[in-house]
Amino acid sequence: MQLKRVAEAKLPTPWGDFLMVGFEELATGHDHVALVYGDISGHTPVLARVHSECLTGDALFSLRCDCGFQLEAALTQIAEEGRGILLYHRQEGRNIGLLNKIRAYALQDQGYDTVEANHQLGFAADERDFTLCADMFKLLGVNEVRLLTNNPKKVEILTEAGINIIERVPLIVGRNPNNEHYLDTKAEKMGHLLNK
C-alpha cells in the first residue's frame, strides 16, 4: 500500500453531499482526495472516475482541454446514479507539474502538440502513476468499478493493480475549437477512445 487514509469530512456541492476522504502518499507526503457519494458498500460495482488534477481546466475554466467538463459530467453522473466515487488524483499536467504544464502550453502555442510539447521538456507523454488510485479504491473497500474514462491505459493499469473494471463508461464532453487538436492528439498518439 502506497497511501494511508488520513482524514474525512462532509463536502456539500451543487450535485449533493459527498464524503471527502483525504489520503497521503507514504513515500512523499503528497495528498490525494476521494469524493464518495452515497453508500458504496455491497457487491454492486460502483460508478467511479479517476480524475487527474487540472488547475487550468477544473478551477480556471480553460477551454484548452476537456478536464473541467469531464469533472462536472462525472460528478453529475455519480449523483444521478445515487452512489459513486471520484478520485481526485493530484498529478497536475499528466504529472509534469503546473509550471511545466505552462511551459508545455507555450510550446503548443508555437505549434507542438501535447505529446511533442512534453517530449520537448524531457517528459514522457504521460507521467502519471495510476497504481496510487488502485490503493485509494482498496482503502475505500472497493474492488469492482464501472470506470468513467476514455483512457484504455488507465483501465489496464488499474486492472493490473487488482481493481476489477466491470465496464468502461465513456466520458466524451467539452470538445470545442480551442481543444480539438489536443483531443485529436490524445486519440491518435495516446490511444484515448474519443469517438464512442
Swiss-Prot record:
InterPro entries registered for this protein in UniProt: GTP_cyclohydro_II, RibA, RibA-like_sf
Any one annotated GO CC term: cytosol
Zinc is among the record's keywords: yes
The organism's place on the tree of life at top rank: Bacteria
Originating gene: ribA
Active-site residues from the entry: D126 (proton acceptor), R128 (nucleophile)
Classification via PANTHER family: 3,4-DIHYDROXY-2-BUTANONE 4-PHOSPHATE SYNTHASE (PTHR21327:SF18), GTP CYCLOHYDROLASE II-RELATED (PTHR21327)
NCBIfam families (alphabetical): PRK00393.1 (NF001591), ribA (TIGR00505)
Cofactors required: Zn(2+)
Enzyme Commission identifier(s): 3.5.4.25
UniProt keyword terms in alphabetical order: GTP-binding, Hydrolase, Metal-binding, Nucleotide-binding, Riboflavin biosynthesis, Zinc
Family membership noted in the UniProt record: Belongs to the GTP cyclohydrolase II family.
Cited Pfam families: GTP_cyclohydro2
SUPFAM superfamilies listed in its UniProt record: RibA-like (SSF142695)
Keyword Membrane: no
Residues the entry annotates as binding GTP: R49, V50, H51, S52, E53, Q70, E92, G93, R94, T114, T149, K154
GO-annotated biological processes: riboflavin biosynthetic process
Binding annotation for Zn(2+): C54, C65, C67
GO function term, MF aspect, one: GTP cyclohydrolase II activity
Assembly behavior: Homodimer.
CC cofactor note: Binds 1 zinc ion per subunit.
Function: Catalyzes the conversion of GTP to 2,5-diamino-6-ribosylamino-4(3H)-pyrimidinone 5'-phosphate (DARP), formate and pyrophosphate.
HAMAP family xrefs: RibA (MF_00179)
Name the UniProt record assigns to this protein: GTP cyclohydrolase-2
Reactions this protein catalyses: GTP + 4 H2O = 2,5-diamino-6-hydroxy-4-(5-phosphoribosylamino)-pyrimidine + formate + 2 phosphate + 3 H(+)
Pathway assigned in UniProt: Cofactor biosynthesis; riboflavin biosynthesis; 5-amino-6-(D-ribitylamino)uracil from GTP: step 1/4
